[in-house]
Amino acid sequence: MAFFRAYAAIVVRPVLAMYLLYGVAFEAHQQNSSVLFDATGRPRKLLIRDFGDGRSFAPLFQQRGHRIEPFTREGILPTTFDDDISLVRSFVIDACFVCHLHEVALCLDEHYLFAHTTPWHILREEIESAFDALRPRMLSDAFWLDERKAFLEQPWPTRSVLRMHLERYRDYRVEHELPNPVADLA
């Protein structure tokens, strides 16, 4: 479990930092994430590639003194939002937590017997730790509390990919909710 704790921390901390501090969501699923290991096999760094499908919340980015111009082109759905951060949050949860860390946790749970702590307990602890570490740098305590609740207590939104493909991406907001595997584990 020490390995999964280190792995989860390496993935969760930078992904949540970029989202909570700047409103930037990277598509940090397994295909786009490379974890660098040291000589002893411990996870040390996260590299994220494929920035073609990230999302951003312009007001939070601007509050940090930066400016972002939305990329617009006919046939390309927007990736920068001004009025609703939930579209950015759901992107983080879907890519990083549902399609990456939850999959690793499921695999570990299937192949190993855990006496006391499950992978989901560890994932929750690492999410809590990341939120706690970022709290002093947050611009709004209310925002921090709302986001913490969304990641730790509320159902997790995930993209309905098959439906989006069948509908030719006419609506990028096609989502459904999954039970949050880290809720009720505190």
Where are these regions (language model features)?
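Catalytic activation segment of kinase domains across protein kinase-like and atypical kinase folds
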Residues: V24-R89
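Long, compositionally biased intrinsically disordered regions
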Residues: H111-A186
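Intrinsically disordered, low-complexity regions enriched in small/polar residues
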Residues: L21, R73, D171-V174
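Conserved kinase catalytic-core segment
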Residues: M1-V35, S90
